[in-house]
């Protein structure tokens, strides 16, 4: 099978790459000066989110800027996020394919405002298969880190059910997730 373009992605036998034209379009953008331009930016980035580690955290300043009650105030945090994302996209790695039945690994990450996961395969070198991320709603931001971690895992299983059905996925984290998931009684007594 050769290389080709499908649904805006470049497909190769060894994996999937973001369309370089989409990356160039983001890199050509100047600093947004109004909410409409921020919406254009976030739309362009959303099309590339599967290639961006911790997407929700990286784009949070832009989404905060779009909140109606806050008003439009492009600040240093937005400027840094904009520059960092452009730089990140220039170095974006190819997402590799996985063979049926191959063991996969998932790292979960939590922050104050988002949960993220990366699905990897490991053949001596870890290679990303898929990145996912979720911005936390107000109530979720008050979860304990372990609860956010479980939320991250639930979100990952909902976003990537085909990987969990076709592969053994080892979830890697610094938290004692296994002991929590084995508990039979989840009531607070």
Can you annotate each of these PLM segments?
Residues 1-103, 175-177:
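C-terminal reverse transcriptase regions that engage the nucleic-acid substrate
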Residues 13-18, 121-131:
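Flexible glycine/proline-rich, aromatic-decorated loop/lid segments
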Residues 45-48, 146-166:
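Metal-dependent nuclease catalytic cores in nucleic-acid-processing enzymes
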Residues 102-110:
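Two-metal-ion RNase H-like nuclease active-site motif
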Residues 105, 168-173:
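Short glycine-rich phosphate-binding loop at a beta-alpha junction
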Residues 110-121:
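Acidic, metal-ligating active-site segments
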Residues 120-127, 159-167:
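Secondary-structure transition/capping motifs at alpha-helix termini
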Residues 124-151, 155, 174-185:
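A short, polar/acidic, helix/strand-boundary loop motif
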């Amino acid at each position: 099978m050769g290389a080709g373009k499908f649904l805006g992605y470049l497909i190769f036998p060894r994996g999937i790459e973001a369309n370089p034209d989409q990356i160039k379009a983001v890199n050509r953008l100047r600093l947004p000066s109004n909410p409409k331009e921020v919406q254009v930016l976030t739309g362009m980035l959303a099309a590339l989110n599967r290639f961006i580690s911790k997407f929700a955290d990286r784009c949070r300043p832009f989404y905060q800027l779009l909140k109606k009650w806050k008003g439009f105030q492009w600040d240093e945090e937005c400027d840094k996020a904009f520059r960092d994302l452009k730089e990140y996209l220039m170095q974006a790695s190819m997402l590799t394919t996985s063979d049926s039945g191959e063991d996969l690994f998932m790292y979960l990450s939590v922050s104050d405002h988002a949960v993220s996961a990366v699905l990897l395969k490991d053949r001596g070198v870890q290679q990303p298969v898929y990145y996912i991320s979720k911005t936390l709603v107000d109530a979720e931001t008050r979860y304990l880190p372990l609860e956010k971690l479980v939320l991250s895992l639930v979100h990952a299983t909902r976003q990537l059910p085909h990987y969990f059905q076709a592969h053994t996925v080892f979830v890697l984290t610094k938290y004692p997730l296994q002991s929590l998931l084995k508990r039979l009684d989840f009531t607070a007594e």
